[in-house]
Amino acid sequence: MKRSMYAGRVRSEHIGTSITLKGWVGRRRDLGGLIFIDLRDREGIMQLVINPEEVAASVMATAESLRSEFVIEVSGVVTAREQANDNLPTGEVELKVQELSVLNTSKTTPFEIKDGIEANDDTRMRYRYLDLRRPEMLENFKLRAKVTHSIRNYLDNLEFIDVETPMLTKSTPEGARDYLVPSRVNQGHFYALPQSPQITKQLLMNAGFDRYYQIVKCFRDEDLRGDRQPEFTQVDLETSFLSDQEIQDIVEGMIAKVMKDTKGLEVSLPFPRMAYDDAMNNYGSDKPDTRFDMLLQDLTEIVKEVDFKVFSEASVVKAIVVKDKADKYSRKNIDKLTEIAKQYGAKGLAWLKYVDNTISGPVAKFLTAIEGRLTEALQLENNDLILFVADSLEVANETLGALRTRIAKELELIDYSKFNFLWVVDWPMFEWSEEEGRYMSAHHPFTLPTAETAHELEGDLAKVRAVAYDIVLNGYELGGGSLRINQKDTQERMFKALGFSAESAQEQFGFLLEAMDYGFPPHGGLAIGLDRFVMLLAGKDNIREVIAFPKNNKASDPMTQAPSLVSEQQLEELSLTVESYEN
């Protein structure tokens, strides 16, 4: 029989209609001789009623055999419920069954198919096809589909061209580790799965495409966390002949449309703009969460004369004030915060409490002479907790930024109904890597330096600024972009500043440098992390909730057991040997 409609879409206007439904048995209940079944499909749940006085004995026998997650086909008449269930969209109606057949049976599932299950993550991923049956998960992917549909409509209307770029490409340095794919035809050579379509989309601008976009898979072999996966999806854009402001305007319009189409929200345009240095100094993060206050305060000048060497001899002394929560933090609680501070490179965490117009705490005796200035500078009020870090500017900012976010979550200071977008601009071109002992690209080596600082490519690299911009949402980097280098000499200077010899630059990026000999237009773009965006729209804290078949924290798939060993024959065909199969 042909399905008439989705079970979750049956409403009171269908009363008296004969329909056929197909789906899964959510649960079965036997009450007073009647059998009640919750039939579930992707749109929701519909109650079925089987009355032994109104159906054939075979139908009743089939109903009695049903168990959770059996797949069934059922026909009957929609009737009004005697008692409506206000918790269900279908709660005013039920289906009086006339015909019933089993399309497939099911073993007992390892967890219940319902929201709010307590199964651990690996069990959910091992049986991902069952996990995805849960209404909550289905809603996540409906939302994701709405987001991509909205984005495509918006960009199509602006005459962007959707172009697929290669999945098998060249391995290049800078950034995360590549996933490598050995070539059978070209023995000893390897492709790389793209970390982004960065260079190919730039080449499309040189080809005259003018406006490109792609919703594209990318791959990075990096350590995983809640908002990272080894394979992820980007909304990738590139344009020619536009300024950074014009590109940002396009992106803002796209996000505004997505918010309207998916959440019914009007977002205020233009988005706020914040300089990178201000973000770091005030929020301790290059992706500031502006849904709550607790800004970092610089106290270096105030404390430099105190008789406390930890403060007086430090490069900087900065603090955050936790308003009206001093009584919530015992010494044990503060010790936990101190351990977190040490994880970010701080030597420790000094603290004070301000109660009844008096400071108290381990360092209070050193600060009595400046208590008035401190109280005024920090605008202290009763029951405030003050946390200090005395260290380099970078360590103080990063440590207090991390504590600021953790404390806000602990104390429930964040308004989760808000969607606070902003641009972080005026980025440094380079960042120093202690591990590498050299400057690295803060974004990537194709970013255009500002005209005012480009001369420092041969001088002080710390002074070079980039025409770069990150879009931030609620403390997460949603995406990043920049204007790109289109002049060959500037690109060669950039490679040299990053430590490339002329030979290595030619070996790695010769095709790009050659393209710059052929009228490369001014261009720029941006990429937005689709998984992260949908995660935030769905109110989740892990992108696994919005990726159909994600990897776990070991970059493995418990369902398919990927990655897996391969046969000796496959290795021989690729001229590869593996030293050990041991984990």
UniProtKB/Swiss-Prot annotation:
UniProt keyword list: Aminoacyl-tRNA synthetase, ATP-binding, Cytoplasm, Ligase, Nucleotide-binding, Protein biosynthesis
Catalytic activity: tRNA(Asp) + L-aspartate + ATP = L-aspartyl-tRNA(Asp) + AMP + diphosphate
EC class name: ligase
KW Ubl conjugation (keyword) present: no
Annotated spans, Aspartate: 198-201
UniProt subcellular location: Cytoplasm
InterPro entries in the cross-refs: Aa-tRNA-synt_II (IPR004364), aa-tRNA-synth_II (IPR006195), aa-tRNA-synth_II/BPL/LPL (IPR045864), Asp-tRNA-ligase_1 (IPR004524), Asp-tRNA-ligase_1_N (IPR047089), Asp/Asn-tRNA-synth_IIb (IPR002312), AspRS_core (IPR047090), GAD-like_sf (IPR004115)
Residues at which ATP binds: 220-222, 229, 477, 529-532
Gene Ontology biological process terms from the UniProt entry: aspartyl-tRNA aminoacylation
A Gene Ontology term for the protein's cellular component: cytoplasm
Residues annotated to bind L-aspartate: 174, 220, 443, 484
GO molecular function (one): transferase activity
PANTHER family: ASPARTATE--TRNA LIGASE, MITOCHONDRIAL, ASPARTYL/LYSYL-TRNA SYNTHETASE
Protein's name in the database: Aspartate--tRNA ligase
